[in-house]
Curated annotation (Swiss-Prot):
Its cofactor is pyridoxal 5'-phosphate. The gene is hemL. It comes from Neisseria gonorrhoeae (strain ATCC 700825 / FA 1090). HAMAP family: HemL_aminotrans_3. GO terms for molecular function: glutamate-1-semialdehyde 2,1-aminomutase activity; pyridoxal phosphate binding; transaminase activity. This is Glutamate-1-semialdehyde 2,1-aminomutase. It is an enzyme of class 5 (isomerase). Belongs to the class-III pyridoxal-phosphate-dependent aminotransferase family. HemL subfamily. It catalyses: (S)-4-amino-5-oxopentanoate = 5-aminolevulinate.
């Protein structure tokens, strides 16, 4: 029995399912999860000492590569000054100023510790600001695990085929309207029927939790136009896409100014840090200025802020996103070209984020993604993993490239994909 098997058995005896986040359990692909011992650059090593080229990237945060020496040094220096204070720090101001400078839609910003906190509070804030209850989300979009959002959500919920979570009272979700992504007609109908009751629309501006799904230009324009017309708050959930698809996030690519933005992952540089921000008049409804409550013992943790500040510095260096985008396109295009005869396969990418689909076409919504060949993905996933390439253990997860990947490493990955596709077609 190898170390991964030993540790998984040990974990299952004390941790429900053996993991602290469901998708890590390999439930949708089968087999034993790899317990990671260390990570550096574009690689991770499991407890057996096996090295993998990593395209999970801690599910997005590791944009500069794992254990980047400058980030590690920033964390070390911050830790020497104390781990947590429960009081304001200059670093909090600095990172808020940095984010606001990069994202003009962010006039005011509040730090929290997780993407779930950010989206949960942004929705509470939208409801408090508008005095309305209803919210719109889209099937397959994942916005964390707060109760009102666990309705036809993405990520692990799609992996396990659950349209919602047990333990969530129906009353908690009765104000949540779930529409099809990229379906303008449904969006227009929802506002025609309930426009004066809708507090907000929350959307992943590029979906990453039913694999990578792009919005159409018309859909994006409809989101902004209808929310403005009806006085609803448009929330861009950029926890995944922020600083990942472009320096200014998806909103900079769309040319859209959302009312509120949630962010996380990259801004913490691998540490637990997230944020929500946006229009001054909305943000000033949050306590202590307004009546919408939010608090957190570890919000703005100085160690996480130090990691985030250094990461933001690195990603603003000349050529960073041009290089990252080129690497990601090289990977997606290379794997798509490597597919074997008789295997339906497509790929897409934006910035440092990519999608691999065992389907004839790139999906436009959850229904499209649900028709993909999940069994083929399982075979591909394990074929790549057995050859030292780690993708996310779910057909519904987007993948990530970092600045630590090189063209040579991408080409090695594509060569392995050629082998795996041939084995699948045999």
């Amino acid at each position: 029995m190898n170390r991964n098997e030993i540790l998984f058995d040990r974990a299952k005896a004390i941790i429900p399912g053996g993991v602290n986040s469901p998708v890590r359990a390999f439930g949708s692909v089968g087999g034993v999860p790899r317990f990671i011992k260390k990570a550096e650059g574009a690689y991770v090593w499991d407890e057996n000492g096996t090295r993998y080229t990593d395209y999970v990237g801690s599910w997005g945060p590791a944009i500069v590569g794992h254990a980047h020496p400058e980030v590690v040094e920033a964390v070390r220096e911050a830790a020497l000054g104390g781990l947590s204070f429960g009081a304001p720090t200059e670093g909090e101001i600095a990172i808020a100023e940095q984010i606001a400078e990069i994202m003009p839609s962010v006039e005011r910003l509040r730090l929290v510790s997780s993407g779930t906190e950010a989206t949960m509070t942004a929705i509470r804030l939208a409801r408090g600001f508008t005095g309305r209850d209803k919210i719109i989300k889209f099937e397959g979009c994942y916005h964390g695990h707060s109760d009102s959002l666990l309705v036809k959500a993405g990520s692990g919920l799609l992996t396990f085929g659950n349209p919602s979570s047990a333990g969530v009272p129906a009353d908690f979700t009765k104000h949540t309207l779930v529409l099809e992504y990229n379906n303008i007609a449904q969006l227009e109908e929802a506002f025609a029927q309930s426009g004066d009751e809708i507090a907000c629309v929350i959307v992943e501006p590029f979906v990453g939790n039913m694999n990578l799904v792009r919005p159409t230009e018309a859909f994006v324009k409809a989101l902004r136009g209808l929310t403005e017309k009806h006085g609803a708050v448009l929330i861009y959930d950029e926890v995944m896409t922020g600083f990942r698809v472009a320096l200014g996030g998806a909103q900079s690519l769309h040319g859209i100014t959302p009312d509120l933005t949630t962010m996380g992952k990259v801004i913490g540089g691998g540490m637990p840090l997230a944020a929500f921000g946006g229009r001054k008049d909305i943000m000033e409804c949050i306590s202590p200025l307004g009546g919408v409550y939010q608090a957190g013992t570890l919000s703005g943790n100085p160690i996480a802020v130090a990691a985030g500040l250094k990461t933001l510095e690195i990603i603003q260096r000349e050529g960073f996103y041009e290089n990252l985008t080129a690497l990601t396109q090289r990977l997606a295009n290379g794997i798509a070209a490597a597919k074997a005869h008789g295997i339906e396969f497509a790929a897409d990418s934006v910035g440092g984020m990519f999608g691999l689909y065992f389907a004839a076409h790139v999906p436009r919504n959850y229904a499209d993604m649900a028709r993909s060949n999940i069994d083929a993905f399982k075979r591909f996933f394990h074929g790549m993993l057995d050859r030292g390439i780690a993708f996310g253990p779910s057909a519904y997860e987007a993948g990530f490239v970092s600045a630590a990947h090189t063209p040579e490493l991408i080409d090695e990955t594509v060569a392995v994909a050629v082998e795996v596709f041939k084995a699948m077609a045999a």
